[in-house]
Amino acid sequence: MLQGELCALNKSSNSLFAMYRILLIVSVFVWNVSAFAQSGKLVGTVVDGSTGETMPGTRILVEGTNLTTLTNFDGEYSLSAAAGTYTILVKSFGFSNKSISGVVIKPGGETSLNVTMEFAKGEALEVVTITASASRENVNALLIQQKSLSSVSDGISSESIRRTPDRNTGDVLKRVSGASIQDNKFAIVRGLNDRYNAAYLNGAPLPSTESDRKAFAFDVFPAALLDNLVIVKTASAELPGEFAGGVIQVNTKSFPGKAFHEFSFSTSYNTITTFKDRLDYQGSSTDWLGVDNGARALPTNMPTSNQMFQLTSAERVQVASKFKNDWALQNKTFLPALSFQYSGGSSKDIGTKRLGAIYSLTYNQSNQYNTTRRQSWQNAVGSTEESLMESDLLDDNYVVNTLAGALANISYSAGPNTTIGWKNLYSITSQDRVLMRNGTRQPIDAPNQVLRQSARWFTNNQILSSQLNGSHYFESFKGKLQWLASYSGISRSVPNLRNTLYYGDTDVPDTSWRAGITSTSVGPDYSGSRFYGLNLEGITSGQATFELPLDLVDLGIRNNLKVGIGGQYRDRTYTARQFGYVLANFMTFDQNLLNAPIEEIFGAQNMNATSGFSMREGTKSSDSYLANATTSFGFIQFDSRILEKTRLNWGLRAENFEQNMYSKTDNNDTVQVESTRLDILPSVNFIYSIDDAQNLRISYSRTLNRPEFRELAPFAFYDFQTRYVVTGNPSLVRSTIDNFDARYEWYPGKGQVFSVTAFYKNFINPIEQATREDVVTEYTFVNVPKAVDFGLEFEGRLLLSTLFGKPDHKVLNKMTVFANYALIRSQVSLNLPTAADSIRPLQGQSPYVVNAGIQYQNDESGTTISAAFNQVGDRIFIVGSSQEPSIWEKGRAVLDFSLNQEVNEKLSIKLTARDLLAPDLIFFNDIDNNQKWSEGDDQMWRSNFGPTISLGLTYRL
């Protein structure tokens, strides 16, 4: 079975690659339509001024002409007209008419006009007409959409993304209020561990990208493919129940306003990487695409694990001879990073129908070199004595990162009341790494021992997301129906991770290096180990929501009912195999072979049953597992405006969750987890509108956090970078969180915002990663009884003209300062006498998150300059035990700079600088228990980084 699962790697890669080709074909055959030279387009969105919701079925008329159209399900409209200046009339039943003057339509251009409508009471709805200018109306529409959301949320638009140096979605997340990034890819919202977030792509759930943690790596999506990114921080009945930090909604582009082509190219220089020497090894011819072509696969006709354990010594020698001698390392040079991207799109109006497509291809290859000093210590928890160093190692890391993606979205509007969309995204990320480790092991009461270790491995992630969605508006009773069916699949493979380990003696001058190989044991602690891992996961989901207004027009009462049902099925297959070279015959083995260099020691000439090596299977029965989970849900939600200034969004969500996991222990005993749980999740969001620009929000919700498949499985995996073994815990249970939020927000206009939020979260049975009591070099996952998390979050995005009280100042009106600061405290209640800290923060919780920056934007000259700063506070990485103190991560300060200059309407140049401060990344034992890095703490790992300077060109047709 294991062999068959590993063979599935090539099949899955081929099928995903086939989908990649299909997306390319779609992009090639989609037509492009050019605008007529003497006409232009008027496009925009109509929203309800009191709720911020879009208004389908609204009539748009061009006064003095016969031109008219209706908004579609999403409140959007598109209207072609001859070039000129017009007055636009907007009508919708139940709302005052709106007349907008001074609307300019340019030849061959596209004019954006977003409109807000005011709810009318009684007889006034048929006679009142409100007039406004085009420029002011656009600003008002943006303001209304920002302030009228029922949930607390923050986000960033595609236009803002273009002004940053960000390459992928992980970089973009750092710009969102209260968010930060760990390991350059995992989201931290309000300082909470990444496990408390939910990731959604165009409304459909995304599976975990990691085989060993509950997290989604947001670096898999190129930033150029995004339409917007929103983090919802408070729950409502329509949102998934499993989150406490935020629901991260990644939305890709759909209907283009007009036909376009865009080509981008950039290159970058890293101060400690580019043009420096690097070590490499023989990989495959398709590594540059981010995929392995099979060069790292297991040899053909390889015996299964069970068969390997039955082989004779001579037969194991034959198996050893099947493997290539692929251990040699080569000297190369790190070249500058390269990035290419093409995006295109078009739309065609066919009467009242509209067909549109957006497609994109992106490719990015970057390099990274850094050093990491790794130390381990012997120290008693709470002891005042100086710690004794057990090991002192220095890692040289040589990494090549590849990211490739394709997007193809097709949308069809069958008139103003029906829209069908098909959205597809395929992404490949890979990391090709060589690690060289040198240093000293100094066991207590033993001679010093030096080691030289090398590891080389290739990690590949492939994600395919495809979804079909529909939106329908029923004009007769103003009902809205939305449905979605989607599939997301992830393939994560680590083919042929190879490790060598040589030992020497510091007491012997010019020591000879000997490979650490025995006659019986194999694994990451021995030379010549090979590891093959494959994780296949898929999510199939579907949902439907229906929305109906229940307004009492005569009383001026607005009420909206939304109900929905849906479900998702998620399954995972994880398989792993491990091999290692051993002495075929201890008595007759040629000991001189252990002194052979890396490139020679495992050559075919050294595989024999008397004086050479054979191959032994190191796979354990716990190294594979199968798991699946089924979630079915239903919700009912009311959005009510009882008084003019008050709004109440409230509802109930029911989620039935069934989870199954099947595995084995190392002793081949069956491990089976079968659980079913029905949860009723209430949510209430109250909004009081102080005036047109200010809101006060109060909310409560109950949410969940469920154990990940990997966290339940007893599989043990050795992490070369941390030197820890990670194991699962089948006894984990789901956690519940009660969330309370209060927020004041002010929108002074022109895209400005200021807000203050207080939040409190009460956790029951939160899940943490903690050091095992019996093995201090292993960590697992545990439930702690209770925890609380509370804090304040400040956000501001203001023009300098507003700050200095000079609204008409030309320069200050072009400069925006933005900042958000989250101050967070958490406390875990421990009933465990063996806990490392009697009072401590929640694992992964940062005490503060800071994002700040300044931007200058001159539309006349086409110049945009921005600088952004991000930092988080020190946080617990791994919870300690009675034998071992907790490991903490020191927060890094990140400073980025960007300059974008439009040369003309088609060409722009972008200069960026990332991580200008480049502080070291430090993990440490908090010896003095002050919950931060300070002199006297034991340093565990310390990695260095260098700034990256990039130069890019973008050309638009």
Model regions: which residues?
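Periplasmic N-terminal accessory/gating domains of Gram-negative outer-membrane beta-barrel systems
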Residues: V104, A134-I188, D194, G203-A237, ...
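Transmembrane beta-barrel wall of Gram-negative outer-membrane proteins
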Residues: K41, F323-L435, L464, V684
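Short, acidic, small-residue-rich periplasmic hinge/interaction motif at the N-terminus
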Residues: V47, R59, E63, K91-F93, ...
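Surface-exposed extracellular loop regions of Gram-negative outer-membrane beta-barrel proteins
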Residues: A204-P205, P597-F613, E658, Y688, ...
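C-terminal beta-signal and adjacent terminal beta-strands/loops
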Residues: S801, V817, Q871-I878, Q901-L957
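Outer membrane beta-barrel strand-and-loop segments of large Gram-negative receptors
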Residues: G523, N535, G542-T545, L593-L594, ...
